[in-house]
A protein has these predicted regions:
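Acidic, metal-coordinating catalytic segment for phosphate/diphosphate chemistry
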Residues: 1-30
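Short, well-ordered beta-strand micro-motif
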Residues: 33, 104-108, 127
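Conserved Nudix-box catalytic region and its N-terminal flanking loop in Nudix hydrolases
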Residues: 35, 39-75
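A short coil-to-beta-strand element that immediately follows conserved catalytic motifs
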Residues: 79-89
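Active-site-adjacent beta-strand/loop module that shapes the phosphate/pyrophosphate-binding cleft
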Residues: 91-114
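NUDIX/MutT-family hydrolases
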Residues: 115-147
Length: 156
């Protein structure tokens, strides 16, 4: 696990340096997915120590809405209709000289099936007031905005 984590971090830093040098921006799509009990879905990747909102990068020519529908299906086995995807907020984030624009959606209606992703080590549902300790800082801020009605920030 440590080798995969270290390899990912090195590859990610190299990629971000190249993107920065080329002046590229990136766009990502993530979702606050809630269930009927009011719990939120979080994922833990094989290459990161924290819990995150599910989602990922937007492919060339793909809309952010299509990206979150695809990512939820690939990562956690959720099937979401386009009409059940509601925009929450768009943020700006800089990492290693690259501007990233995470787009967050709210998902309340979906069906699920068993999915296996090499990227996801663990997925779990949590009540907002019982989140695990290792939630990423950005994820925690987004959940505060949604569940505690904290002001929505512009920066990730």
């Amino acid at each position: 696990m440590k080798i995969i984590n270290c390899s990912y971090q090195i590859a990610n830093r190299v990629l971000k340096r190249v993107q920065s040098w080329m002046g590229l921006n990136t766009v990502g799509a993530r979702a606050i997915v809630t269930n009927a009990d009011g719990k939120v879905l979080l994922v833990k990747h094989t290459y990161q120590p924290h819990w995150y909102l599910p989602g990922g990068g937007v492919k060339n020519g793909e809309s952010t809405k299509a990206a979150i529908i695809r990512e939820l299906h690939e990562e956690v086995g959720l099937i979401v209709s386009e009409q059940d995807v509601a925009l929450f907020a768009i943020y700006q984030h800089s990492y290693l000289g690259v501007n990233d624009y995470p787009v967050i959606y709210i998902i309340k209606n979906y069906t699920s099936h068993i999915a296996y992703s090499r990227e996801i080590e663990q997925m779990a549902w949590f009540y907002y007031d019982e989140l695990p300790e290792m939630v990423s800082p950005g994820t925690k801020r987004r959940l505060n905005e949604y569940f505690a009605n904290a002001p929505i920030a512009e920066k990730w």
